[in-house]
Amino acid sequence: LLTLASTTGCGSQEKKAATAPPQVVNITYVKSPLNIPSIIDKNINTVSKAFAKTNTGINFPEINSGAKQPETLAAGSLDICSALGGTSAILAASNGVDVKIIGIYSRAPQAFNIMSKNPELKTLADLKGKTVAGPKGTILHQILLAGLDKAGLQASDVELLSMDIPPSVTAMLNENVDAALVAGADVLRAQKAGAHILANGEGLVDATIVIATSNKFLQTHPEAIKQYLEAHKENIAFLHKNQAQAYEFTAKATGLQPAEVRAMAPWYNFDPTLTPQDLTELEKTQEFLLKAGLQKNKIDIKNLIVKL
């Protein structure tokens, strides 16, 4: 585990660069699966107000793809990934992207589900020889493989069609596939249309989503990173103190009813503190990626993490 003190330079020019606030910071806005702190920020502008104190402008590009966030980070047009799947962060780092994890966005094993509309399919063991739709190389994919292994099956026992969550749900509801990998608000959408849950991440993976930045931005603007994390914590505090309003914001952003948001909110642990258990989960994630053939180069997960 790296500390900020060990990753910042000591020369006078480096100190000057580190203390000069950036003119603009680009931070992803990702509301799925149910990113309540981000939705709160969209409504009360906590991050923008915090950076206004240093005359720093904020852009919030909506980049939902876990693969595209690190690509944009590497290109220099993104500074902070507000909510990035642990799978995506590890894959990016193994492919040479100089990404650093600076906190945890959420842990939500119950929010990531394998679902089916076929009443004959009741457990993951029933998926042998079946077709599943969902995004490859993601937390959902990891849950599928871990669940199949627990059920005594192999990845080759099912056919996985790689597609985003909404079309996966549609394909399942239209009975074009036997099951789908589903998260967040789409779980309720699928249930309302007659689908049921075969399994979720409980007992398999913690479904860790991280907060990340580029090492270059961290080195150049460590104070901006701290500024962002403090503002993010304020959004989490708002959630705890003003639940009803937070759920109203989230319902409006997702198309859910406030009561549905209230039912789903307990699935999520938004504590940003990175714990030893989080490190263990990220190491488990790397093992999944290597075993699935999605990752070629093994990395030291501890070197991926910076504690501020």
Features from the language model and the residues they span:
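Short loop->beta-strand "edge-of-pocket" segments that line small-molecule binding or catalytic clefts
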Residues: 25-31, 125-137, 237
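Pocket-lining segment of extracytoplasmic ligand-binding domains
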Residues: 87, 157-161, 165-250
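A local structural motif
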Residues: 20-25, 49-62, 77, 150-162, ...
